[in-house]
Amino acid sequence: MPSISVRRLFDDNQYKLQLAWAAGNSGADNRIGVEADKPVLALVGHLNFIHPNQIQVVGLAESEYLNRLESGETGYQFGDLFDISMSLVIVANGLPVSPGLRDYCHKNDIPLLTSKLESPYLMDVLRIYLQRTLAASSVKHGVFLDVFEIGVLITGHSGLGKSELALELISRGHSLIADDAVELFRIGPETLEGRCSPMLRDFLEVRGLGILNIRHIFGETSIRPKKILQLIINLVEADDEYMKQLDRLSIRTETESILNVNVRSVTLPVAVGRNLAVLVEAAVRNYILQLRGKDSTREFLERHQTQLKENEQNHENRPD
């Protein structure tokens, strides 16, 4: 199961959530991870002793209860209630940290952080952050581009010209997200987000030219940090026999499953004389039309069928 350390969570959100260490620095490597019986959204919540969260957030009501607990009003000790598995405690709303909670976290190597933000907002941000960071992921070989605001993954065997095609599309005003190793994350039940690893960001390898820095050559708008994957275009090598067998009037929708998410796919034969950049743009435009309920192939077949019926009726009504 994917997991991250408390240290990474702190580094990624320190300024956004105004986080500060209060105790438990030795537990900075505690892991926060997805459990089989708990979704990501259940990792964060207000202080709960019955169904403990991995990240326990102390708000106004929880702080008041802890103060009563420390004063002995409840008849319980910290150890009686805190004998639970948790990775991190955050005291929100700019509240002071009770000495009892600080001592308990220090003795048990539980990171204790403070934040000046209100606890509901703090939890919302952390849930979104964890949902993206701990999402199921996969790496696909190909080039990931933003074409007409649609996330397009171009795949195919090595040597078919994926990088050259990407370079042509970038020169036509489209944007590069990732080359070679595309990281895909399932951020929702039916949503895949494509990103590029920090090491490969901005770079595109083109045979004969080497490594190109796309941002430096084409400017800031030629690069996108991430994009939702909506369309896969698979390049295949085509010979005369393949082109003869190609069904040119198919209305069947092809999909490819990635991380149990079905993504629309299109197969483009690579042959001498074909302008692949124009074909990719046309495929994306056609996909956008289909999202609006318009299918050119189906429309042509319906028009063809109507014409056949009219011809048949005219033939029957023709006098002998």
Curated annotation (Swiss-Prot):
Instruction: Name the cofactor(s).
Output: Mg(2+)
Provide the residue positions that the database annotates as binding Mg(2+): S163, E205
- As given in the record, the signal peptide range reads none
Region Important for the catalytic mechanism of dephosphorylation, residue ranges: 269-274
Q: Which Gene3D superfamilies match?
A: HprK N-terminal domain-like, P-loop containing nucleotide triphosphate hydrolases
Query: Quick check: keyword Transferase in the entry?
Result: yes
**Which amino acid positions bind ATP, per UniProt?**
G156, H157, S158, G159, L160, G161, K162, S163
Q: Where is the active site?
A: H141, K162, D180, R248
Q: What is its EC number?
A: 2.7.11.-, 2.7.4.-
**Has the keyword Transferase been applied to this entry?**
yes
Q: Name one Pfam family in it.
A: Hpr_kinase_N
Q: Output the superkingdom of the source species.
A: Bacteria
What's the catalysed reaction? [HPr protein]-L-serine + ATP = [HPr protein]-O-phospho-L-serine + ADP + H(+); [HPr protein]-O-phospho-L-serine + phosphate + H(+) = [HPr protein]-L-serine + diphosphate
Chain spans, region Important for the catalytic mechanism of both phosphorylation and dephosphorylation: 204-213
The protein's GO terms of the molecular function aspect are:
ATP binding; magnesium ion binding; phosphorelay sensor kinase activity; protein serine/threonine kinase activity; protein serine/threonine/tyrosine kinase activity
A single Gene Ontology biological process assigned to it is: regulation of carbohydrate metabolic process
Sorted alphabetically, which keywords does the UniProt record give?
Answer: ATP-binding, Kinase, Magnesium, Metal-binding, Multifunctional enzyme, Nucleotide-binding, Serine/threonine-protein kinase, Transferase
Listed InterPro entries: HPr(Ser)_kin/Pase, Hpr_kin/Pase_C, Hpr_kin/Pase_Hpr_N, P-loop_NTPase, Ser_kin/Pase_Hpr-like_N_sf
Task performed by this protein: Catalyzes the ATP- as well as the pyrophosphate-dependent phosphorylation of a specific serine residue in HPr, a phosphocarrier protein of the phosphoenolpyruvate-dependent sugar phosphotransferase system (PTS). HprK/P also catalyzes the pyrophosphate-producing, inorganic phosphate-dependent dephosphorylation (phosphorolysis) of seryl-phosphorylated HPr (P-Ser-HPr).
The record's comment on protein family reads: Belongs to the HPrK/P family.
> What's the miscellaneous note?
Both phosphorylation and phosphorolysis are carried out by the same active site and suggest a common mechanism for both reactions.
Domain notes, please? The Walker A ATP-binding motif also binds Pi and PPi.
Instruction: Enumerate the PANTHER family for this protein.
Output: HPR KINASE_PHOSPHORYLASE, PROTEIN YJDM-RELATED
Known partners and oligomeric status? Homohexamer.
Protein's name according to its UniProt entry: HPr kinase/phosphorylase
